[in-house]
Amino acid sequence: MASILLSIKPEYVERILSGSKKYEFRKRLASKPVEKIFIYSTAPTMQVVGEVQVVGTISASPTALWEQTKGSAGITRDKYRKYFKGCKVAHAYRL
């Protein structure tokens, strides 16, 4: 299993580290199975601030993925839909 470094906006970093955001959404997954994500908080923080264990991944249509994850998504539906606009498949790392 691999470890990866992901750039994440500070508002989402806080939610991940507090445990209220249990999914990290991505348009693509890493090519190898991921065991750990090192979190790089983007501007204004601009540094690695922590790490989280990955317990699995989910891939589905954006609508189906939202229905599965919305309770602990840590993101508004509007921002989620904007991020995945035009995508046929959406992915999430389960944290």
Where are these regions (language model features)?
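Structured alpha/beta reader/binder surfaces that contact nucleic acids or chromatin modification marks
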Residues: M1-R94
